[in-house]
Each structure stands twice: as C-alpha cells, then as structure tokens.
Regions:
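Soluble non-transmembrane domains of integral membrane proteins
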Residues: 1-169
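Channel- or pocket-lining gating/hinge segments that regulate access to a cavity or pore
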Residues: 169-242
C-alpha cells in the first residue's frame, strides 16, 4: 500500500547454526539426520535452543505457515520456515510513475544482543526465484532484485545503557512500469490540455467559443482526474502526474 507505506511479501526463512549439545551418533540412533516437521513437533518435541526471529518493521501481519527443522550428527541445525508478512518501508513517490523503491524487511533475534547472537548472511540460501515456472512477477512493476545484509546498531535505553543489536536486512529493489498509468491517465490528460490550447489559434472575435472550449477542457481534465483518482497513489506531496 503506497498510502500506508507498506508492502506484502511471502518467502522462506532459512537459518543455520551449530549446537554441539544436539550431536548424536547415527550408529546408536539408527538414523542419519533428525527431523522435526510441523509446529507440533517443533514446539512440543524439540528441546534444543533456537533463535526466535521476528520482523522488526512488521505492519499488521506476520504469519508462519510451515516449518522443518533438520539436525545432522555433528550438531548442525537447519531451520526452514514459510512466512507471509506485511512490512513498513519508506516510499518516495515524487517521480511517480517513473519511481523506484527500495523495500526492506528487517529481521532481529528476540531477547539477544549482538554479543550473544550474531546474524550472518548465507549466500547459499539467499535469493529470489528466477526460473520460468516460479519467476516473481508483480503487476505494474518490473522484475524485482533482491539483496541481503547484516546491520549492526545500538539502541539507547531509558536507564542510559547502550545496546548492541544485530539485524538481518532483506532489500527488494523494484522499478515501476509506467505504461499502464500513462495509458490510463497521462496521455489522455495531455490530449485534453492540447485541445484546450487550441483557443490561442482561434479567431480573436470568437470570444464566446474560446471561453466555452477553455471551460470544457478544464472540466474534462478535472472529471477525468476524479474518475481515475483510485488508480493514483493517495499521498499529500506532488508527483510528476500532479
């Protein structure tokens, strides 16, 4: 939503850490890897530690739809979870409909500072689907580009203490395809304005006709703007289209 400066996204949250306390001997257990599937097994059966990640810039929704936890014999833990969320991110629409946006989702670990838990980017599990069958396409936008990074920052608490937190930032760079907006709003308004300018080439003695054309042009542009106002972003500052 451009008016609320929010965006909706779906994705897979993948994490990997090592906990030697969870190591086991396959010859004793009889299995090579240990799996916990679904929230019942994860919440009720799994007894190890895991980083509880939350969306710091959440704006109205963060749903967890499926989870798989895999533990290898040496204590490596692989956490995979499907998520759907709405995040708050700054929109700059001054160049609408030729604008570009940087949408960011910021994840943090609940209850731990960077001295205890440090987040790192894993290039092997970070990316966006780009094949023909699963390619991400957004109406009125060109194909998005994804990047990720770790941000370190220090919040100040009311008792004067400075904290040190680590956050995982996922950034989606998108560029708007202006053709729909120009075809629907931009080009028709330009034609109406040009027709209104035709009064300057009319006979000077035809004052009444010139006034009629001018008022008709103004009313047509205003009516057209009102008719298609729902297709334009509801923001207070001006854009290229007005």
């Amino acid at each position: 939503s451009e008016a609320d400066e929010t965006f909706h996204f779906e994705g897979v949250l993948s994490m990997h850490w090592k906990d030697p306390r969870l190591a086991f001997d396959p010859a004793v257990t009889g299995y090579d890897d240990l799996y916990y599937q679904g929230y019942y097994q994860f919440n009720e059966v799994f007894t190890g530690w895991w980083p509880q990640v939350f969306l710091a810039n959440e704006a109205g929704g963060f749903e967890q739809q499926g989870i798989v936890l895999r533990i290898t014999p040496d204590g490596n833990v692989y956490y995979t979870e499907e998520i759907e969320a709405v995040a708050k991110s700054h929109f700059n629409l001054a160049r609408y409909p030729f604008d570009r946006q940087q949408l960011a989702a910021i994840f943090e670990v609940l209850g731990f500072e960077s001295e205890e838990v440090v987040l790192r980017v894993d290039p092997a599990s970070s990316g966006i689907w780009d094949d023909d069958e699963h390619k991400v396409e957004i109406p009125q936008w060109y194909s998005p580009k994804l990047s990720s990074s770790v941000v370190e920052y220090g919040p100040s608490y009311l008792d004067g203490r400075d904290g040190h937190l680590s956050a995982f930032r996922v950034q989606i760079d998108v560029e708007r395809d202006p053709r729909y907006t120009l075809r629907l709003v931009g080009f028709p308004v330009i034609i109406f304005v040009i027709l209104s300018w035709s009064v300057f080439w009319m006979d000077r003695s035809s004052v009444g006709d010139r006034m009629d054309i001018t008022f008709m042009g103004i009313l047509t542009v205003v009516a057209y703007q009102i008719m298609f106002s729902g297709s334009l972003p509801k923001i207070s500052y001006p854009t290229i289209l007005g």
